Amino acid sequence: MSYVPHVPYVPTPEKVVRRMLEIAKVSQDDIVYDLGCGDGRIIITAAKDFNVKKAVGVEINDERIREALANIEKNGVTGRASIVKGNFFEVDISEATVVTMFLLTNVNEMLKPKLEKELKPGTRVVSHEFEIRGWNPKEVIKVEDGNMNHTVYLYVIGEHK
């Protein structure tokens, strides 16, 4: 069994979700993976509003999985959005063209070898709030949401070092 990260569940605000997908220029040709998908909001938005080919959430928490599956059904994207139950360190993400995450800097650090090994050149990696140390972001944006300022980092595999 590999490392099981403890990342507190904090939902990404809807405005930030949209900007994360926009900064990655998500389109109908993309396969989006959200690592630690929580209630499924990123994959649902990717499927519903960006019409992606496929959106996959990876989640380990049973309560969050139930919530995400209910939200997928409620939003009518059952055919294009799905949940994989598991530890994102162990789930194969090699088909992804976009990976989104709202984890912690130390977890991002531990994920670097997996991302570099499994993702193809050109795959976009979007991190909400926490950078991936040692990688050069292609773009960094600030997103205001109420009285909170959020930072979104875009990395592109093959251009990240």
Swiss-Prot record:
Changing residue 36 to R: Almost complete loss of catalytic activity. One of its GO terms (biological process) is methylation. Keywords: Methyltransferase, S-adenosyl-L-methionine, Transferase. It catalyses: L-lysyl-[protein] + S-adenosyl-L-methionine = N(6)-methyl-L-lysyl-[protein] + S-adenosyl-L-homocysteine + H(+). Optimum temperature is about 60 degrees Celsius. Is active over a wide temperature range, from 25 to 90 degrees Celsius. Has half-lives of about 30 and 10 minutes at 80 and 90 degrees Celsius, respectively. Induction: Seems to be expressed at similar protein levels when grown at 75 or 85 degrees Celsius, or in the exponential or the stationary phase. Its EC number is 2.1.1.-. Belongs to the class I-like SAM-binding methyltransferase superfamily. Catalyzes the methylation of lysine residues in target proteins, using S-adenosyl-L-methionine (SAM) as the methyl donor. Exhibits broad substrate specificity, being able to methylate the crenarchaeal chromatin protein Cren7 primarily at 'Lys-11', 'Lys-16' and 'Lys-31', as well as a number of recombinant Sulfolobus proteins in vitro. Methylates lysine residues in a rather sequence-independent manner. This is Protein-lysine N-methyltransferase.
